[in-house]
């Protein structure tokens, strides 16, 4: 790996930068509309050469001097669209008029938001229709004002029409900003000459509110796009979960077009004082009578918190901190739960789980665009959605984050089951699998919380198992069919279902209580009356169905990585038998929802295991145990599955942190200096707060290093590489010929390489290299020889040397 400096946060302000967020000096005039992002400019009306200045409660084009101009911070809301943020921390905006102000007040009120949730947004649509109909007659767009809050009336689209010449359009009203008599700013249907503007670099802008990253130093990147990578992997993340379960369960979101002040706010139904937050109390072990503080940005007195499970923990700047700290790959699992969505009274989205998958896939591409917009244009952002291992390797070697899409739902591909009758066919599975592949999905689980037409589920233990069993009944018409496992099944077991007389205060660590399932129990107020089960250990009779076996084989054919987590023990065993028989390496156990018999089989197949992150002490112990399962034929790398935003608690503070604390600042991956993370007025400390939000994962890894030394960190830095090599084999690339069970390459095979081939073409032709250093690959050949393929600066094969 070569350390290069890329877009670092300097200690002082860069001229023309509102917040010292960018290190590359800006040109006096932006080269295109994307270059405006994060910059500080004077806005000049080219028809009069006058700059925008303040005038009463608005702005006019009123001065020929840049020194007198209002310094405007351009805050990107999407590619080419901006909030124009003034020195008084206000916005250049169109007046919303009398009706518009009433509509805004109604929709933003607690009552308005709750009614909107209960009616799935139909009341909001009706109110908007009234505003759109009556707005123009009551002042909507009648003036350009200094708006107090960001809104669609302050969200401007910038287009370049000539060199140094731009138009400013308000998409909400489909009108252009123009300059009239006396420099008055008006809206017009056409831009014309009076609607042409230029932007001149200046300083003095107000700082737009934002979460701090708190990481300094170089970003580790590769010397070439195709060499071996280093970096951490999280194979189980739910970044788009703000849209799941109807879209009203989680409070906050990973980004908002209008910034952190809109993204990190509590839910309206948590007011007043958190007393309405029943689900939060259930999931996080609180008391709805006592409530909780609801302040979000900038004080965060209660949330984010490692065990506050209805509040956002994966804001994009927190993810940026994790990326700067060494995260180079993660799988965002598109997630939903029909049962809980049907029960929860507030919603804005469909409860169909596959509708949720489609919506969240759309949203994550919107986030990619948003980060691109902050970074200077299309493709410039550090957050890159990838669909094959070659693309992912290139992204990581560029020093960016490779994002894989996956699915974790109970009724995957709409393949539910009712009274043992499946609701899908093999043909429908094929068609729907093609659809999600087209969405970019490359990693999938077959089940989540309930049996479906593909597989039985492992179930939950303890009191939570009672409610998930009830949920299974409501979703499938059948209780979980558990029986005592046969002795020969050994440790291949499901979670033991308790009978009613078993509920005698068994610790949650034994009952296996799960936040999502507990939410269903408390939200319904039902304990259920489940069957009387025989003695444990329990095994779900429902194993892998013929439809499930068909789907796994189709996933293998399409190169989709299979995750056995949440399947019943017998289904997992049968699934891994298929993986073995098909010699399919595309398997990952992403977050510890399998059993101890499965993890060695995953690694033996050439797959990857990324256990549930949780507390650093427990994770260290898991690493020490699982490392013994490593198969020497494959690169061993270790990752984690955070399950963040998926109703899974993050790691709390280590109990003995006071005796052996993480000390700040510390040196992270690639020589970075990692300080305590600051979000508004709140400063976080891993020793006190645990993993309160995703930005504290670099701190968590440092905590691991304190316990396990450099060895555990080294294995985790190989996590992304191990996954990439597994992914290559998943899509049909032949294994490394240096393996003892793989035939060495012949002269004829190596001779089939042609000058000018790309690294991808070389690998597709003769298989995985044994080493990938800088611009050269090595391969094992017959006769104990080594072939070295060398590439030029453009990434094309120039020579193959055999020695």
Where do the language-model regions lie?
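Extracytoplasmic
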Residues: 38, 227-230, 234, 774, ...
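Long, charged/polar, surface-exposed segments that mediate recognition or autoinhibition
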Residues: 89-105, 154, 744-755, 761-763, ...
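A mature extracytoplasmic/lumenal domain signature
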Residues: 47, 56-58, 78, 88, ...
């Amino acid at each position: 790996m070569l350390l290069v400096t890329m877009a670092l946060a300097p200690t002082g302000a860069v001229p023309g930068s509102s917040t010292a967020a960018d290190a590359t000096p800006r040109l006096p005039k932006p080269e295109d509309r994307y270059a405006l992002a994060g910059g500080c400019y004077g806005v000049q009306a080219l028809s009069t050469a006058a700059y925008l200045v303040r005038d009463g409660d608005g702005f006019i084009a009123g001065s020929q001097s840049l020194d007198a101009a209002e310094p405007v911070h351009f805050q990107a809301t999407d590619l080419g669209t901006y909030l124009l943020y003034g020195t008084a921390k206000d916005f250049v905006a169109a007046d919303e008029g009398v009706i518009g102000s009433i509509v805004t007040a109604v929709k933003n009120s607690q009552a308005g938001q709750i009614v909107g949730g209960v009616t799935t947004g139909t009341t909001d649509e009706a109110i908007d229709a009234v505003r759109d109909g009556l707005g123009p007659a009551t002042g909507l767009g009648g003036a350009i004002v200094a708006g107090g809050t960001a809104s669609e009336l302050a969200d401007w689209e910038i287009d370049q029409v000539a060199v140094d010449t731009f138009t400013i359009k308000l998409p909400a009203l489909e009108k252009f900003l123009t300059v009239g008599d006396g420099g008055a700013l008006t809206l017009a249907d056409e831009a014309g000459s009076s609607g042409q503007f230029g932007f001149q670099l200046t300083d003095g802008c107000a700082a737009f509110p934002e979460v701090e990253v708190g990481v300094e130093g170089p970003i580790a990147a590769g010397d070439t796009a195709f060499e071996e990578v280093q970096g951490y992997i999280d194979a189980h993340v739910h970044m788009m979960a703000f849209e799941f379960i109807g879209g009203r369960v989680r409070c906050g979101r990973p980004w908002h077009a209008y910034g952190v002040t809109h993204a990190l706010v509590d839910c309206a139904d948590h007011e007043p004082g958190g007393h309405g937050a029943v689900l939060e109390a259930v999931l996080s072990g609180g008391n709805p009578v006592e409530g909780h503080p609801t302040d979000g940005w900038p004080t965060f007195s209660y949330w984010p918190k490692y065990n506050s499970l209805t509040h956002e923990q994966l804001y994009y700047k927190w993810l940026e901190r994790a990326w700067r700290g060494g995260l180079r790959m993660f799988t965002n699992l598109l997630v939903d739960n029909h049962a809980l969505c049907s029960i929860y009274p507030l919603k804005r989205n469909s409860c169909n789980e596959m509708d949720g998958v489609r919506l969240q896939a759309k949203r994550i591409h919107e986030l990619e665009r948003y980060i691109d917009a902050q970074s200077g244009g299309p493709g410039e952002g550090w957050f890159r959605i990838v669909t094959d291992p070659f693309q992912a390797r290139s992204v990581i070697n560029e020093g960016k984050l490779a994002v894989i899409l996956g699915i974790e739902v109970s009724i995957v591909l709409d393949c539910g089951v009712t009274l043992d009758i499946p609701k899908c066919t093999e043909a429908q599975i094929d068609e729907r699998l093609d659809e999600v592949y087209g969405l970019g999905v490359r990693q999938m689980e077959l089940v989540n919380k309930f049996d479906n037409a593909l597989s039985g589920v492992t179930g939950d233990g303890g009191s939570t198992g009672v409610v998930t069993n009830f949920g299974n009944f409501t979703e499938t018409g059948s209780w979980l069919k558990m029986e005592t496992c046969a002795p020969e099944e050994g440790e291949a077991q499901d979670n033991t279902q308790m009978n009613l007389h078993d509920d005698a205060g068994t610790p949650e660590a034994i009952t296996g209580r799960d936040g999502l399932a507990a939410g269903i129990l408390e939200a319904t107020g039902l304990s259920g009356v489940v069957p009387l089960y025989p003695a444990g250990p329990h095994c779900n009779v429902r194993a892998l169905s013929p439809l499930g076996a068909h789907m796994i084989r189709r996933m293998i054919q399409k190169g989709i990585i299979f995750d056995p987590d949440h399947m019943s023990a017998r289904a997992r065993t049968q699934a891994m038998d298929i993986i073995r028989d098909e010699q399919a390496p595309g398997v990952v156990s992403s977050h510890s929802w399998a059993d101890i018999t499965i993890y060695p089989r995953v690694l033996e197949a050439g797959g990857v295991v990324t256990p549930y992150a949780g507390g650093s002490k427990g994770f260290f112990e898991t690493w020490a145990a699982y490392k013994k399962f490593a198969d020497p034929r494959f690169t061993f790398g270790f990752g984690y599955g955070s399950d963040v935003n998926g109703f899974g608690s993050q790691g709390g503070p280590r109990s003995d942190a006071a005796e052996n604390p993480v000390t700040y600042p510390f040196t992270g991956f690639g020589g970075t200096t990692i300080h305590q993370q600051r979000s508004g007025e709140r400063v976080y400390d891993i020793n006190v707060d645990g993993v309160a939000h995703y930005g504290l994962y670099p701190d968590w890894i440092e905590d691991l290093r304190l316990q396990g030394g450099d060895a555990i960190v080294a294995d985790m830095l190989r996590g992304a590489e191990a996954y990439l090599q597994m992914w290559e084999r998943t899509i049909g690339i032949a294994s490394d010929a240096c393996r003892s069970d793989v035939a060495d390459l012949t002269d004829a095979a190596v001779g089939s390489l042609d000058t000018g081939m790309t690294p991808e073409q070389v690998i597709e032709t003769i298989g995985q290299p044994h080493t990938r250093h800088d611009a050269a690959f090595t391969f094992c050949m017959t006769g104990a020889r080594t072939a070295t393929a060398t590439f030029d600066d453009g990434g094309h094969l120039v020579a193959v040397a055999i020695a």
